């Protein structure tokens, strides 16, 4: 048995055959069995479910490698402020009033939004009610990399309690949901975690064999303050303290890196960078030197950050902005070609999240894919599929989304979420929290 998807153009992500103009693929029990050009034979379609793509484009599900879904009620809550003021004056006071119900509905809203624009895997770095999110992921079908993030601006006993919570969460949920949930360890940032606390977290990550995630060099201010306190750039400090060696890290942002810091990243192939261009632009943080990182062989993937600083979770738009921004920043139209941008949104993210089972469409990989109907004005003429996916596509063009071969959206209709209820609950809980702040 199984399912065959026929009459489709396939962006495989494979180096040897990145694009199949007219082809088909088969999956069974959540795994891709075969990918081929042409039309399946009568023998191949005997006793299997057949999905006629009718000319749709298929690509790997997109992978959002940095986000805070729990902040999704904060969309538009505060704009046009520097990062530190934005965090301390607007974000953290609101989050301090959020209860379990508010965080739950924020995440429901975020997961649905991501699925509707083609994201099949997301990373959540947050500190509140993480078990609730893991349960929702198991029930509602996406793939997720989850972590209980830790801020260390507290006593050592409080740090140890946070670390205990993070380890318990990580070890409890890693591999759950038929493998759809994996976990990481996450010191929030060098400016919120003293080196002694990060060392404790790194040691625990080593003990339980999990990768690590943190914010790094997002703003010039945090880099300058770290230099005043410790005498060096935070990434250099990580290197000096031995945090990077032989460890799998995913660093979010990396906007303010000089040649020394780029050299360090190049020397550590297990350290990856999540590029969040739209959040960095909106918060005035700057433009990461992604082109130089790519030229050095550093693995770059994409993240949206939270809707509080973006203000959406559309990786299609993030992919386009990432490509265009580097072309303008380095004055080179060849920077980040379409194929590279697609890789950043798919297989590079899989590598960064230590998920070798996804990111491409090929035999043996999990059946995480999306389908796009090119019958819309802004995708004509539809000859140039790779170009259109980066420079013309909109997230709303995604029609079908599958994870592990299970449909999460068909013909733009969510299968595991009540979209009308999501909108009602989001507004109700936002107003309720605002009343608490008065």
UniProtKB/Swiss-Prot annotation:
Zn(2+) binds at residues 66, 68, 215, 305. It comes from the Bacteria. One of its GO terms (molecular function) is S-adenosylhomocysteine deaminase activity. The keyword Metal-binding applies. Its cofactor is Zn(2+). Its EC number is 3.5.4.28, 3.5.4.31. The keyword S-adenosyl-L-methionine does not apply. Binds 1 zinc ion per subunit. It is an enzyme of class 3 (hydrolase). It holds the Pfam family Amidohydro_1. InterPro entries: Amidohydro-rel, Deaminase_MtaD/DadD, Metal-dep_hydrolase_composite, Metal_Hydrolase, MTA/SAH_deaminase. Belongs to the metallo-dependent hydrolases superfamily. MTA/SAH deaminase family. HAMAP family: MTA_SAH_deamin. Catalyzes the deamination of 5-methylthioadenosine and S-adenosyl-L-homocysteine into 5-methylthioinosine and S-inosyl-L-homocysteine, respectively. Is also able to deaminate adenosine. This is 5-methylthioadenosine/S-adenosylhomocysteine deaminase.
